[in-house]
């Protein structure tokens, strides 16, 4: 289980698109450029995010999408360009973050592929790290654990707030990261390849959580290479290539073939020859219904002689 008993169909339907009549731009980046050691990583990039949308970022490795997100969250500072954020009154104001804490205080959070969690500390301690409630100069442990429950319930973490993070599954740790974002009143949450270490069931539960967050008015920026995810949960998609923004499209108006073409800069044609399976091939390794303390879903697979088995 990822974060409790969120209902999950075997086949998820397309998640609701944003209402075009009420869409509002809450984040805008214009002319963003960034170089490292005189090597241009971002070249005059524009980007816009609307309220309560899931905006997908696509591009090959090194295309610049993660660098842009790190600029938006204050990890890096741009060489050129401007960033604007909704001021809560319907206006866009220019912002400049010199560190992630400043972005956090403005409601922008990012969950990286490598979680920023202390394994030997509790869920509650991780959620409020650096912002612990204090009473008479000391940490108020009872209040911290009680406050943590609010955010844990929202992402449906099925564990007590005093549970050590090291005892959680990868999916549950991801939920702790999202709970941290929510505890800072996040209006924008950036997820960097969030399903790379999740099982199929955990992925679908994550999608349910994303839909729930959108209903709360939270916008999601979702970095992914997985086409099936993009068409399942995305509202819009922005494609990067070689440090440039190539295009932004409504998911409903594009195709997988079109996105691949935008990513690689040319038409893509499948040229793989058909693989014929030998029914008598030799099994060299087999696992059946394997369960561990951290991964409750049974795992089964067979590896055959002379074949590459992807996991």
Language-model-detected regions and their locations in the chain:
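N-terminal amphipathic/hydrophobic targeting modules at extreme N-termini
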Residues: 1-14
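Glycine-rich phosphate-binding loops of nucleotide-dependent enzymes
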Residues: 15-311
């Amino acid at each position: 289980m990822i974060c409790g008993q969120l209902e999950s169909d075997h086949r998820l339907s397309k998640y609701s698109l944003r209402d075009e009549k009420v869409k509002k731009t809450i984040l805008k980046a214009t002319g963003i450029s960034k170089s490292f050691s005189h090597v241009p990583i971002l070249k005059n990039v524009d980007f816009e995010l609307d309220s309560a949308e899931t905006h997908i970022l696509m591009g090959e490795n090194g295309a610049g999408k993660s660098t842009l997100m790190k600029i938006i969250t204050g990890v890096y500072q741009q060489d050129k360009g401007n960033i604007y954020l909704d001021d809560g009154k319907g206006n866009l104001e220019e912002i400049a973050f010199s560190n992630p804490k400043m972005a956090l205080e403005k409601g922008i959070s990012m969950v990286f592929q490598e979680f920023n969690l202390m394994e030997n500390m509790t869920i509650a301690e991780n959620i409020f790290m650096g912002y612990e409630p204090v009473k008479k100069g000391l940490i108020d442990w009872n209040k911290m654990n009680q406050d943590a429950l609010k955010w844990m319930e929202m992402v449906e973490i099925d564990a007590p707030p005093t549970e050590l993070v090291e005892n959680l599954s990868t999916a549950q740790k991801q939920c702790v990261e999202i709970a941290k974002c929510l505890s800072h009143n996040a209006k924008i949450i950036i997820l960097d390849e969030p399903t790379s270490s999740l099982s199929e069931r955990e992925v679908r539960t994550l999608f349910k959580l994303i839909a729930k967050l959108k209903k709360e008015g939270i916008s999601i920026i979702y970095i992914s290479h997985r086409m099936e995810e993009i068409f399942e949960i995305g509202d819009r998609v922005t494609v990067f290539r070689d440090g440039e923004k190539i295009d932004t499209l409504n998911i409903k108006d594009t195709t997988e073939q079109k996105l691949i073409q935008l990513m690689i800069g040319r038409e893509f044609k499948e040229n793989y020859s058909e693989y014929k399976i030998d029914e008598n091939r030799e099994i060299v390794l087999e696992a059946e219904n394997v369960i561990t303390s951290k991964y409750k879903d049974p795992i089964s697979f067979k590896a055959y002689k002379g074949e590459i088995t992807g996991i």
